[in-house]
Design a protein with these regions (language model features):
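Flavin-dependent oxidoreductase catalytic cores
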Residues: 1-211
């Protein structure tokens, strides 16, 4: 299984991409090894935090060896519980994860976590990004409901080295220019997400610069 990640990464570089992002978030395979609600293994890949991180680290190590650590990023979603997949102690698990990832000198670690309303102590205590920022020594990207204003605020407050945008890019192929010229954004149609047709993928217009 590790070799499949390597093969895909090598093909991506051969195709001309600048790098790859390992998807260790959102309940997909690597995330399933990481979280104790679904990882019930009793071998070296289950049980302790380090055992549950073993598969992730094997993948990272192998891909870095194949294409170079500077071309590898990884995405984590510490508190994004999807499909019932969660962790009993995400703080401990994901702090340990970024501590172990420090040894690889990756291009970046990408954290998906919605920033809470800090007027709500209950919500803010579960927000792990500040702690992960403290523990991770490399470039940190964050993602989770940011817009241009809140993204700039996060950068000014040194919460991350960069902000990643997902949904806004779906419906705004010229998102960078819209931010640059402070133009309104087109709202994405979520009913076209994860479909097999062109609608929602290629039909969002760019802005009219004459307006």
């Amino acid at each position: 299984m590790v070799q499949e990640f390597v093969d895909a990464s090598v093909r991506a570089i051969e195709a001309g991409l600048d790098g790859v992002e390992l998807h260790a978030a959102n309940g997909f395979l690597i995330d399933q090894f990481t979280r104790d609600s679904i990882n019930q293994r009793d071998d070296k890949y289950g049980g302790t935090v380090d055992n549950r991180l073993r598969f992730m680290l094997e993948v990272v190590d192998a891909v870095c060896a194949a294409i170079g650590a500077g071309k590898v990023g990884i995405r984590l979603s510490p508190t994004n519980n999807v499909w019932g997949i969660k962790d009993s102690d995400p703080g401990n698990t994901f702090v340990r994860a970024v501590e172990r990832l420090n040894t690889f000198n990756l291009a970046y670690v990408h954290i998906l976590e919605t920033k809470p309303d800090f007027e709500s102590p209950e919500e803010s205590k579960d927000y792990l990004t500040p702690l992960l920022r403290e523990k991770y020594q490399g470039n940190l990207l964050i993602n989770g409901g940011f817009d241009q204003l809140t993204g700039n605020d996060a950068l000014e407050n040194n919460e991350a080295d960069a902000i990643a945008f997902g949904r806004p890019f779906i419906s705004n192929p010229d998102l960078v220019e819209r931010f640059q010229y402070e133009k309104p954004l087109t709202e994405a149609n979520s009913t076209t997400f994860y479909t097999h047709h062109a609608e929602g993928y290629t039909d969002y217009p760019t802005m009219d610069m004459s307006r």
